[in-house]
Amino acid sequence: MENTEQEHNLPEGDETQWPNGVKRKRKNSQCSMNSTSDKSISVPGYVPSYLEKDEPCVVCGDKATGYHYRCITCEGCKGFFRRTIQKNLHPSYSCKYDSCCIIDKITRNQCQLCRFRKCISVGMAMDLVLDDSKRVAKRRLIEENREKRKKEEIVKTLHNRPEPTVSEWELIRMVTEAHRHTNAQGPHWKQKRKFLPEDIGQSPAPTSDNDKVDLEAFSEFTKIITPAITRVVDFAKKLPMFSELPCEDQIILLKGCCMEIMSLRAAVRYDPESETLTLSGEMAVSREQLKNGGLGVVSDAIFDLGKSLSQFNLDDSEVALLQAVLLMSSDRSGLTCVEKIEKCQEMYLLAFEHYINHRKHNISHFWPKLLMKVTNLRMIGACHASRFLHMKVECPTELFPPLFLEVFEDQEGSTGVAAQEDGSCLR
């Protein structure tokens, strides 16, 4: 009897063979020849190298994108299977055609039950689908592993960076010794420093404007300026290659770098506990005292530099090499041996960079950050040059030590102090 005949197996396509032999389109079918809304659209994307070209999905035959839940499938079937398991939807699936639908990339959206059964029959594993908590944990683990790999790459890069050569180690040794022999009090500066009395230079006189110089504080600073300048000169004379330069170039370089090196030496002796800098290894001063004693805004720049450098944990060699780089600045106006000075600075910079590699600081991008301090020090030197003119107006000439004037006054056309008999320049 017709009403008892069983439904035949479905033929290819989305047509259904009914018992009476009449072929009918499924209700709500979106696969008619005139419809383009459900045509498979292949979106180009990443395809793993282990897949053959245009390898098909084992569920629907669409282009596969990789192994998903233990089978080679497309993104659509992967997502369908995952959603079904995560939301426990399969008990509610049903088939109108006796569970014998053919699943391909055209019909896959028409019967959820047959599609799910096809997923299971080809070997997709339900136990590999993660619930929300496991999925979050997996993503967290992936991120942690990614960060771990990044850190390993950084460590690997650090280990592969070149360290000083034998000749560079010798250069570093000589520069370090030059610094240690000319750096007042050395590592014992904290024990030997004396604090400038609090009543000196703390605030401008009430009747004066904010840019007046506190003469008492200025007078205290001038007592230590001459030995501080002399130590910078002595440091330069001990450096390889500096004494080979013409006397005129030596003077230009010393005048240009003197304030920069003195500022660096003060900045590395910043004490965060007392919020003071120690000048010339002996006089501890506050920001306001240094500012009101003549330096003005330059004081802020030096203190800010000190705060920043306190995080760098520089050793004597790094401070010494910074000073050498500042000294051998080939862009100082009036130099004659520009190329020679530039090559000298390059030698110091290369040895410096290799020494930084050897030290392996924990600060990221340590080398470029440290080079930025050279720029900061150059700006301090430039600001002090204009500030010096203000001090000359505000302070009596007799308060200025001769060497202070000689180094910081503009003496175009003059070489300053005459050369000594041994050919060295400045005192």
Swiss-Prot record:
* GO molecular-function terms, A-Z: nuclear receptor activity; RNA polymerase II cis-regulatory region sequence-specific DNA binding; zinc ion binding
Region: Disordered; residue ranges are: 1-40
Tissue pattern of expression reads:
After the mid-blastula transition (MBT), expressed throughout the deep cells, which give rise to the embryo proper. In adults, isoform 2 shows highest expression in the eye and liver. Expressed in adult gonads.
InterPro entries named in the record: NHR-like_dom_sf, Nucl_hrmn_rcpt_lig-bd, Nuclear_hormone_rcpt_NR1, Nuclear_hrmn_rcpt, ThyrH_rcpt, Znf_hrmn_rcpt, Znf_NHR/GATA
State the protein's purpose: High affinity receptor for triiodothyronine. In the absence of thyroid hormone during late blastula stage development, acts as a transcriptional repressor. Whereas in the presence of thyroid hormone, can act as an activator of transcription. In addition, represses retinoic acid (RA)-signaling during blastula and gastrula stages of development.
The entry assigns this protein to a family as follows: Belongs to the nuclear hormone receptor family. NR1 subfamily.
Protein name from the UniProt record: Thyroid hormone receptor alpha-A
